[in-house]
Amino acid sequence: MSTAVESQEELRLTSLGAVDCDVHPRSPRRQDLMPYLDEYWRDMFTSRDIDHLDLMSNPEATAPNRRDDQVDANADAETLRDNHLDKLGLTAAVLNVVSGIHAVYDPYLATALCAATNRWLAEEWLAKDTRFRASLLVPFQHPEAAAEEIERYADDTRFVQVLTVAMGEMPLGRRLYWPIYEAAAKHGFALAIHAGSTFRHAPTQSGFSSFLVEDRIVQTQGFANQVGSLVAEGVLTKYPDLKVVLLESGVTWLPGLMWRMSKDWRGARVEIPWIKEAPSKLIREHFRMTTQPFDGPDDEAEAEKAIGHLENDEMLLFSTDFPHDHGRDLTVWPRALPSRLAGTISRDNVLSTYRRLEISS
């Protein structure tokens, strides 16, 4: 049942029992992963002095959107629970570890890191509170091993999606990655694409940027490229049950992409005969976008017009990006999002997207 209120000021998160689709625990360090590595990789980590793997597109040292009052708010499961889940009255929270694992060149090291991180998440986070859910880290550098990792966690429904980043080694629609999507679709995992870059390639069509702020704003191009690739290469027609969640992508750019891709498809569809319907229809059926950070107008009426161009209220999923700071009070429903859709965005859409997620009413 969707939540509707007369005044947005009355709508506090605690009244919704929301599911937060983008919460960040701290990234694991060597001492965290050692218990979950075999002897070979423990020796390798020590000899190569591998400790903490930052994703260079979002280095922890800069922390441009870190809340000063929440520096250690995600240090462990208990602290995250107290600072976020309890404070906001959340029904569940999806934990996303975005780290340098996504950028490791060695496919075997990446496989070991993903497996160890998943075990660490399961034992040190998911086991500590039944409201925690998580994204499964799999090595896109080694698709066969990634599919095996998905199979390994098929019966652990605390893991609800498979995670990668928006700007990786190649477009995600390539057949190289299809074993990952086949395993994910088979077991009800969504595919989650988070803002971030492995810097395998320059993040812009003109080369590398000079400043972090430039890298931040071109992330949207990375998301747009992946949407186009997944549609055009036929992933969504091959795996019709697969949902794709765009994390920290923004929202307002997608309607224009849907219109343009459908327009150009009408003239060039001879190249992709497996696409039998307009790309805009496929995108509305398969893609979902998280609400934080929202790139629309701060006025609710104007924001509703922008969201209306999606032509599908089911495409938005509630998120906070905690503990990152986007300049608003997390305890109150976001001003830019229509209050009439609060229940739809914060619960209904989440449950219909994540087939593996079960929560009490």
Identify what each model region corresponds to:
Residues 18, 63-70, 82-107, 131-139, ...:
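Divalent metal-dependent hydrolysis catalytic cores, especially in the metallo-beta-lactamase
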